[in-house]
Design a protein with these regions (language model features):
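Secreted/periplasmic carbohydrate-active enzymes, especially glycoside hydrolases
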Residues: 1-218, 222-226, 271-272, 286-287, ...
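Substrate-binding/catalytic cleft of secreted carbohydrate-active enzymes
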Residues: 193-196, 203-434
């Protein structure tokens, strides 16, 4: 029963919550196609590569491969790739082929393929999500899609995209709306992604099931890395099979009921296949996850082996692949990422000190419930310091709750577990997001935004007037991406401001020294506020959007907050002190 494999922490609702449609197609049509892209450094084809259809005299830098299988016999099929302006950059015909044992491409069962070389390619990344237009034409049908030229791999325990180390600034996201539940509209998806972009988030884990297909297409367009997760979670239902459900017995037989039970292998593999087949052509998907909190054993081993055989072009992930009994050993060769939830910093350091062969990913960290998330800067210090840390996904994006009208004073009312009279529920444990159910940001999201800012001050020599700023982007020149200005604050009041000129390139993960020698007031507590703003419009963000800031103390002869000193010189022993700021009122009696 699939119910045992769907124990995700969320409101569980019934009914049809995604679009269902019927599609009429020609009998002789392309049944399925798979698109992969790879980069060829230096202009030479990789060893063992199939013949390449070249696009003019331009040097080969990227290759797009399209594989297909037909419904009722092959028909002439033309594949064309055009750039954003509509100019055709490569074209060719699907031809029969037989995959060899050393075939590095995607899929099983494909009978035809074409390889197209693209000279001087515009590569896809979350920082620059450039998409080409793919057209597949048969006598009775035209299929269109969008393609991002990119390559993801692990070398030296470092995740790389297009040859450069990759950092995932991600969140775990459920489909959840206070009014419509898991039925999510297109504008709802755009709103989520816009909020994420505004807060320097570049990655999404589809926890814990495949999302609406349109969501992945938006991630392609707007620039997000996606870990696409299979609909597979059994962490609570495992114990239902145990006659003795005591904790000691659960530990002893932690994975036997489902994860290490061959009777569940077909169901587990099927869910993995459904996830991969549907999103195999999405450039935003850089990793497949076999599920969440299902324990580990023969079922997950089989699912992950299938993924690596079918799609060696992406990474594989599964967090619950540890074992309770030290006598047992399982197959981890099909897992590319070492994944942990909520580890202590020391656990991360111990792993990195062990000379690992897999990158470390925080698949869930900094639980955002209540006054969380906490320790964000501590985690990001170690992420920034070691390329083998490829980032992580904060748990989680939004609070889960059900809209229940408004209170007498007009505020929205949301219900959570137990408010409906149900006997079995999670209480408020699904109210654990960075935003409210109706997408109002919580304070923790503002902190996350600044921790993940694209640049930061690493040194300021006040005597020499030299400010050193590091570019924390993975693929983009900071001078192209951001404008930098500063303000001098005296007791919190701006007394001077100026733009800083980025006249030289600042490549990813490098630093630049800028002249910054403002006049510092002789009295008061003073700070240098360095502000990063978006240099030009992006699909979801307007130019001048504030990306983050640094605040650096400034020395002067006094250093005391004069406003506090003035209050001390004129104490008030009666009445009330009222502080107002941007509509927020605090009364101190």
């Amino acid at each position: 029963d699939g119910t045992y494999l769907e124990d995700q922490d969320k409101f569980r609702t019934s009914g049809i919550f995604r679009d269902v449609y019927l599609l009429s197609r020609p009998r002789q049509a392309l049944f399925d196609y798979a698109v992969t892209t790879s980069l060829v450094p230096g202009g030479g084809a990789r060893s063992g590569a199939a013949p390449v259809v070249r696009s003019g005299a331009a040097p080969e830098r990227a290759v797009i491969e399209v594989r297909g299988v037909f419904r009722a016999g092959p028909v002439p099929t033309t594949v064309r790739l055009a750039d954003r302006q509509g100019a055709v950059v490569a074209t060719g015909q699907l031809e029969p082929f037989t995959p060899g044992d050393d075939d590095p491409g995607i899929g099983t069962g494909y009978t035809h393929r074409v390889r197209l070389a693209v000279g001087d390619p515009h590569l896809w990344s979350a920082e620059d999500p450039y998409l080409y237009h793919l057209t597949i034409t048969t006598p009775g049908e035209v299929i269109t899609d969008r393609v991002g030229l990119r390559e993801v791999e692990v070398t030296g325990a470092v995740v790389r995209l297009n040859g450069r180390p990759l950092t995932l600034r991600g969140v775990n996201r459920h489909d959840s709306d206070p009014a419509t539940g898991p039925a999510i509209g297109l504008e709802h998806m755009r709103r989520d992604l816009r909020l994420m972009k505004e807060h320097n988030i570049n990655a999404v884990r589809s926890s814990h099931y495949p999302n609406d297909p349109r969501f992945y297409q938006l991630c392609d367009e707007y620039g997000f890395y996606v870990m696409s997760e299979a609909d597979n979670e059994s962490h609570g239902t495992q114990t239902r099979f145990l006659a003795d459900d005591s904790w000691d017995n659960q530990v002893e037989h932690w994975n036997e009921p489902i994860a290490d039970n061959p009777e569940w292998t077909d169901a587990t593999v099927d869910r993995m296949q459904l996830c991969v087949h549907r999103e195999k052509n999405r450039p935003s998907v850089i990793a497949w996850s076999a599920g969440n909190e299902c324990s580990y054993g023969c079922t997950l081993e089989a699912a992950l082996r299938w993924v690596k055989d079918f799609d060696p072009t992406r990474l594989t992930h599964y967090e619950s692949s540890y074992y309770r009994d030290s006598k047992r050993r399982y197959d981890y060769s099909c897992i590319d990422l070492y994944s942990r939830m909520y580890p202590a910093i020391e656990e991360i350091r111990d792993y990195l000190d062990s000379d690992p062969d897999k990158p470390f990913i925080l698949v869930e960290y900094c639980h955002a419930m209540g006054n969380g998330p906490g320790d964000l800067e501590d985690y990001w210090e170690i992420i920034r310091a070691d390329e083998r840390m490829c980032g992580g996904f904060v748990w989680e994006w939004c609070d889960h709750a059900v809209a229940a009208g408004t209170s007498p004073d007009g505020r929205p009312v949301h219900l959570y577990g137990g408010d409906h009279g149900e006997a079995v529920h999670d209480g408020n444990f699904c109210v654990d997001g960075l935003v409210s159910p109706d997408r109002v940001p919580h304070p923790g999201l503002a902190e996350l935004k600044n921790v993940q800012r694209p640049a930061r001050v690493v040194d300021y020599d006040q005597d020499e007037g030299l400010l050193t700023i590091r570019n924390d982007l993975d693929h983009t020149d900071l001078a192209h991406y951001a404008r930098i200005s500063y303000e001098v604050l005296r007791d919190g009041v701006v007394v001077a401001h100026e733009e800083l000129d980025l006249v030289e390139p600042v490549p990813p993960h490098t630093s630049i020294m800028l002249r910054c020698a403002p006049d510092v007031p002789a009295t008061g507590r003073c700070h240098l506020l360095v502000i990063y703003r978006l240099a030009q419009d992006q699909p979801l963000l307007a130019a001048d959007h504030v990306l983050g800031f640094d605040e650096v103390p400034l020395r002067n002869a006094d250093g005391r907050t004069r406003r506090v000193a003035a209050l001390a010189d004129h104490p008030s022993r009666a009445g009330r002190v009222t502080v107002r700021r941007e509509g927020t009122r605090i009364d101190v009696g």
